[in-house]
């Protein structure tokens, strides 16, 4: 819904939603181009006197929505990775955010965030065939999983969103 979108600045937007099981989600959209595109969707919705960004027909096209989620996931993964590379102290901050979110949701973090996620078998071959990495940073992947895609597992995020 349009009312669930909060502009932080010219290149940052927070989108609030309630997901499965009543989990309160916040998706962070970053980048001047992405924010400008979102403003276009909001403007169109307002002109159509619609509370929602997408029409019912658009929302029924899963490929389009999945593509948008995958692009947002990939952009955020790379931004988090870059952030941690530029300032190694940020890694501990991301880990703490992940732990706090698991605690807030009453879940137990079972993954070892210090161990890279390595694709194997068919998924490894598929990634290599399209020029994608076969090793992923688990902290960046889990951050994307929790705060962008609202999953609790890195394997789902990596296989269905980052390797696409």
Where are these regions (language model features)?
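Short, charged phosphate-coordinating catalytic segments
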Residues: 1-11, 157
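C-terminal/domain-terminus segments
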Residues: 37-42, 159-164
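C-terminal catalytic core of Y-nucleophile DNA break-rejoin enzymes
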Residues: 19-40, 50-72
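Hydrophobic core segments within long, regular secondary-structure runs in both alpha-
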Residues: 2, 35, 142-146
């Amino acid at each position: 819904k349009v009312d669930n979108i909060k502009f932080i600045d010219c290149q940052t937007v927070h989108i609030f939603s309630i997901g499965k099981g009543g989990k309160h989600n916040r998706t962070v959209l970053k980048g001047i181009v992405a924010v400008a595109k979102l403003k276009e969707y909001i403007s169109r919705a307002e002109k159509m006197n619609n509370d929602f960004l997408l029409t019912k027909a658009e929302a029924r096209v899963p490929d389009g929505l999945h593509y948008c989620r995958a692009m947002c996931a990939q952009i955020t993964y790379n931004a988090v990775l870059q952030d941690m590379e530029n300032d190694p102290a940020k890694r501990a901050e991301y880990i703490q955010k992940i732990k706090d979110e698991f605690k807030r949701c009453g879940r137990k973090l079972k993954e070892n965030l210090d161990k890279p996620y390595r694709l194997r078998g068919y998924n490894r071959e598929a990634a290599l065939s399209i020029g994608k990495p076969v090793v992923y940073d688990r902290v960046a992947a889990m951050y994307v999983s929790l705060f962008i895609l609202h999953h609790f597992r890195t394997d789902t995020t990596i296989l269905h969103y980052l390797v696409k």
